[in-house]
Amino acid sequence: MSAEEQRTTEEVPEWKRQEVAELVDLLETYDSVGVVNVTGIPSKQLQDMRRGLHGQAALRMSRNTLLVRALEEAGDGLDTLTEYVEGEVGLVATNDNPFGLYQQLENSKTPAPINAGEVAPNDIVVPEGDTGIDPGPFVGELQTIGANARIQEGSIQVLDDSVVTEEGETVSDDVSNVLSELGIEPKEVGLDLRGVFSEGVLFTPEELEIDVDEYRADIQSAAASARNLSVNAAYPTERTAPDLIAKGRGEAKSLGLQASVESPDLADDLVSKADAQVRALAAQIDDEDALPEELQDVDAPAAPAGGEADTTADEQSDETQASEADDADDSDDDDDDDDGNAGAEGLGEMFG
């Protein structure tokens, strides 16, 4: 170590060493660490936010040079946060994920009064209604800043919502005083996250500003679509294998019933199907004497089974008619052969 380096090391106060050590310990304790902007936050609101984050996140303020030194010494990529250490900032650390941290900080923001000389973050409106202030000079102050105010029913009334300063304009002394008198706090103060580092990834506020419920619904919808695609494409995965097996079993059973494949698993269904077909066929025969005794006075099965049975019966009837027609043709052919033989015998007798 050179004399200059040794002299520089000796000049570092002990309290700074201790401060950096505590900051490094904080950085190494939590999963997610961010840099937040605290500019313009009154001490009261800052303390309220610190209490609101208690148990969920830790907020630590220090000199920027010490924050940078701690981020560099902690390593593991945390030094990427040093670019955000500028102005009035602090470190916030949590075991929550970056999206959860962002939501915590947004929810911790509170309304605050605005001072003269500040830029209006949005349109500043004096709302319609009773101000609760007795008649006096204050009505003139309201009118001076552009509020439609009158004395009515023994008090100062604002007759309609009045924009007294538009977004982006500088707040005047008169507007600041009137707002303070009315107890209107037009701006929102809170810890603005500049960047957060978690599990080796640096996140910006723009990346974290999402609707968590909507995002969760999108993920669930995508997962359901992927599952359906896997099942319909017969692509087995750990999650879809049970569904594919159940689907295959159902399709195999349906095919077995349609093809009347003999199987112990299909025996009961095949017997039920055959019974329905027999009953449907028996119901189509008008002559009960032509039926076995056990099939006499039977009713046709229910509509679904009956439709299937009727189709089968019609097919069988068509086959029977076709068979009878074939038999008739054969009989005609036999008769023709007999007639031909008889004619030949007659000619033989005629010509000796």
Curated annotation (Swiss-Prot):
GO molecular function: large ribosomal subunit rRNA binding; structural constituent of ribosome
Family matches, as Pfam families: Ribosomal_L10 (PF00466), RL10P_insert (PF17777)
Keywords of this entry: Ribonucleoprotein, Ribosomal protein, RNA-binding, rRNA-binding
SUPFAM superfamilies the UniProt entry points to: Ribosomal protein L10-like (SSF160369)
Compositional bias per record (Gly residues), positions renumbered to this chain: 343-352
Disulfide-bond pairs as recorded: none
One GO term describing the cellular component: cytosolic large ribosomal subunit
Spans annotated as Disordered: 286-352
Annotated Acidic residues bias: 286-297, 324-340
Keyword S-adenosyl-L-methionine tagged: no
Assigned protein family: Belongs to the universal ribosomal protein uL10 family.
Further comment: Was called L10e in this organism; in this case 'e' is for E.coli-like, not eukaryotic-type protein.
NCBIfam families, per the entry: PRK04019.1-4, PRK04019.1-5
Function: Forms part of the ribosomal stalk, playing a central role in the interaction of the ribosome with GTP-bound translation factors.
Subunit architecture: Part of the 50S ribosomal subunit. Forms part of the ribosomal stalk which helps the ribosome interact with GTP-bound translation factors. Forms a heptameric L10(L12)2(L12)2(L12)2 complex, where L10 forms an elongated spine to which the L12 dimers bind in a sequential fashion.
Protein's UniProt name: Large ribosomal subunit protein uL10
Organism of derivation: Halobacterium salinarum (strain ATCC 700922 / JCM 11081 / NRC-1) (Halobacterium halobium)
Organism lineage string: Archaea, Methanobacteriati, Methanobacteriota, Stenosarchaea group, Halobacteria
